[in-house]
Design a protein with these regions (language model features):
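Beta1/beta-strand and adjacent pyrophosphate-binding region of the FAD-binding site
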Residues: 1-10
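N-terminal Rossmann-fold NAD(P) dinucleotide-binding loop
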Residues: 13
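Glycine-rich FAD pyrophosphate-binding loop
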Residues: 21-42
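Dinucleotide-binding Rossmann-like beta1-alpha1 core, especially the glycine-rich loop
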Residues: 38-110
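Predominantly flavin-linked oxidoreductase catalytic cores and closely associated redox partners
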Residues: 119-241, 302
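Conserved FAD/dinucleotide-binding core of flavoprotein oxidoreductases
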Residues: 210-263, 285-296, 311
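Conserved mid-domain beta->alpha element of the FAD-binding
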Residues: 267-330
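Long, low-complexity C-terminal extensions of enzymes
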Residues: 307-406
């Protein structure tokens, strides 16, 4: 196998090209997307697996912050979902997660923060521009700006379908291939905006704030703040969102509506004999952004596809692994809503929902469930606190980092 075609230029297309061009310089990679390509991306809040994916492929934290306009993400703060606000920090082991949560609460950053299991916020449009330049180093990459309607139009053995919510290729060969999750997580839209970032919003974490008919994300990028009100489109949330922005002193930025086609493919792969097609990213699966799983599921899918291509797993195993990871995450996300205190049609839907709890997957260990279901806080030892004596307020740390200082 030496020929791979990546079709589509959303974030999943960019990451697929980056992965296969880097890992397999002996392969011929063809990247095909239309001249009028439009991406859905907003400010992305990622998880450590995405940061590790990028770093393994040569993109350093310094480049993410300095060149892509990114910022630190140590975890997520959940406000007003239940009667007590809580944090869901990153960290490989309990001790590290406890320390990261402590750092989040004080918003002071130690000098060795890059050695922790952390991630980043970044603007996907900036990532795309950065990668456009990065890709110039690849001798094995051919870019064709055109519209492709059939895999028969391209002379390749493997096709990676990165066509987003249109799901243009794999689903062409299956009837009713998309499995909806509206019975568990019915959010299917977001009102989004960008604004200048005030100092009180410059945090080293994403904030998710529960509202009457959904929740609002605050993603503090390096130079701007992105916000989005995630909801089901049967509810009109515009006025509530505008009132929130006014209360927070964020003005009246222009709002943009993003529709989300949630669910997953039942089959992510089709073998046509001389041609093989696999879906990655939004064309494969999407839930909703509350735990920043969009790019995680993309990089998870790319890595499992690599195993399929090189026959380390079978097609059935590939489908099973991807679907299991997705299905557990759906339950994990639904659990965020199940114990909300609000009494209206939106929140009451979740109270009666059957959710399989404490089921682990690659993304979320039992500790993550404890944070969400019990709002559990791990204790920090005095020895750990001593490590943070010289920690700096995040805004100062970020400015120093940009200047190459500690």
């Amino acid at each position: 196998m030496s020929n791979i075609a990546v079709i589509g230029a959303g974030t999943s297309g960019y990451l697929s090209v980056l992965y296969f061009c880097t890992r397999y310089p002996e392969y011929n990679i063809t990247w095909i997307y239309p001249e009028d390509n439009v991406t859905i991306g907003v400010g992305e809040s990622t998880v450590p697996q995405v940061a590790e994916f990028l770093e393994d492929l040569g993109i350093t934290p310094k480049e993410i912050i300095n060149d892509i306009g990114g910022s630190l993400k140590l975890g997520i703060k959940f406000e007003d979902f239940v009667t007590t606000d809580y944090f869901h920090p990153f960290g490989i082991e309990d001790d590290e997660a406890a320390l990261v949560e402590y750092i989040m609460k004080h918003n002071k950053i130690p000098d060795d923060i890059m050695s922790y299991d952390i991630s980043f916020h970044f603007n996907v449009a900036n990532l795309a521009k950065f990668l456009d330049n990065w890709f110039k180093r690849f001798d094995n990459l051919t870019i064709e700006r055109k519209t492709v309607k059939s895999v028969d139009e391209v002379d390749c053995e493997w096709f990676i379908d990165c066509t987003g919510f249109t799901r243009a290729f794999v689903n062409e060969y299956y009837t009713d291939n998309l499995q909806s999750i509206s019975n568990k997580v019915p959010n299917n839209a977001a009102l989004v905006c960008r604004t200048n970032i005030p100092n009180n919003k410059r945090n080293a974490y994403t904030t998710c704030k529960a509202m009457d008919y959904g929740w609002i994300w605050n993603i503090p990028l390096r130079d701007e703040l992105t916000l989005g009100y995630v909801h089901n489109d049967k509810y009109d949330v515009k006025d509530e969102f505008l009132n929130y922005l006014e209360r927070e002193g964020l003005g009246s930025p222009e709002l943009r509506e993003v529709k989300m086609s949630t669910g997953r493919n039942k089959n992510h792969y089709k073998d046509l004999g001389n041609k093989k097609i696999a879906s990655v990213g939004l064309s494969s699966a999407f839930i909703e952004p509350i735990e920043s799983t969009g790019l995680y599921l993309t990089v998870f899918g790319i890595e499992k596809l690599d195993q399929l291509i090189h026959k380390k797993i079978t097609a059935d195993e590939y489908n099973s692994i991807v679907n299991y990871e997705y299905d557990v995450i759906v339950d994990f996300i639904a659990a965020h809503y199940k114990f909300g205190y609000r009494d209206n049609s939106y929140w009451n839907f979740y109270k009666n929902l059957s959710v399989e709890l404490y089921k682990e997957c690659a993304a979320y260990p039992t500790r993550s469930w404890n944070y969400v279901l019990q709002n559990k806080t791990l204790q920090v030892t005095e020895l750990q606190k001593n490590k943070l004596k010289n920690a700096k307020p995040y805004s100062i740390w970020l400015n120093n980092y940009l200047k190459g200082q500690k």
